[in-house]
Amino acid sequence: MSVPTLSNKPETVDLLVLAPGEKKVTCTISDKGDCNIFVIKLEDHTIGNLIKIQLCQDPKVLFAAYRQPHPLQNAIEITIKPKGYAGVKLLSDNVNNILSQVATLKENFAKKIQKYKESNSYYEDY
């Protein structure tokens, strides 16, 4: 007996690699003209939620949300309603802020591991 397959399941390579000439991020303006809608390909809820939380903490942003349009599509949409600022700049600044926070976290984590190894003789063999 054969194993049933999902006919609408995308190819694995389409979930991991952008097609030639395809852009990672695209930006459109909402129908009302007050929001920027960014589509980020090859990303999921992990980065979407992180960016949304960072944007919601920014005083230059009135509204921020994200959604994954379809579970079989490996893309997210981030909607930003800025307070008179350029949405592209807001997204860029907030992503750079996230990268800075991650770098700080990584540095602090490495320091704590080193301090733990120095105080614990069990790890001297490694």
Swiss-Prot record:
HAMAP family attached to this UniProt entry: RNApol_arch_Rpo11
Quaternary structure and partners = Component of the RNA polymerase II (Pol II) complex consisting of 12 subunits.
Sorted alphabetically, which keywords does the UniProt record give?
DNA-directed RNA polymerase, Nucleus, Transcription
Keyword presence, Acyltransferase = no
**Biological classification of the source:** Eukaryota, Sar, Alveolata, Apicomplexa, Aconoidasida
**Record GO terms (molecular function):** DNA binding; DNA-directed RNA polymerase activity; protein dimerization activity
One BP term from GO = transcription by RNA polymerase II
Known function: DNA-dependent RNA polymerase catalyzes the transcription of DNA into RNA using the four ribonucleoside triphosphates as substrates. Component of RNA polymerase II which synthesizes mRNA precursors and many functional non-coding RNAs. Pol II is the central component of the basal RNA polymerase II transcription machinery. It is composed of mobile elements that move relative to each other. RPB11 is part of the core element with the central large cleft.
Q: Which GO terms describe its cellular component?
A: RNA polymerase II, core complex; RNA polymerase II, holoenzyme
Protein known as: Probable DNA-directed RNA polymerase II subunit RPB11
Q: Which InterPro entries match?
A: RBP11, RBP11-like, RBP11-like_dimer, RNA_pol_Rpb11_13-16kDa_CS, Rpo11-like
Species this chain originates from: Plasmodium falciparum (isolate 3D7)
Cross-referenced CDD domains: RNAP_II_RPB11 (cd06926)
| Entry similarity comment | Belongs to the archaeal Rpo11/eukaryotic RPB11/RPC19 RNA polymerase subunit family.
The domain of life for this entry's organism is Eukaryota
Q: Where in the cell is it found?
A: Nucleus
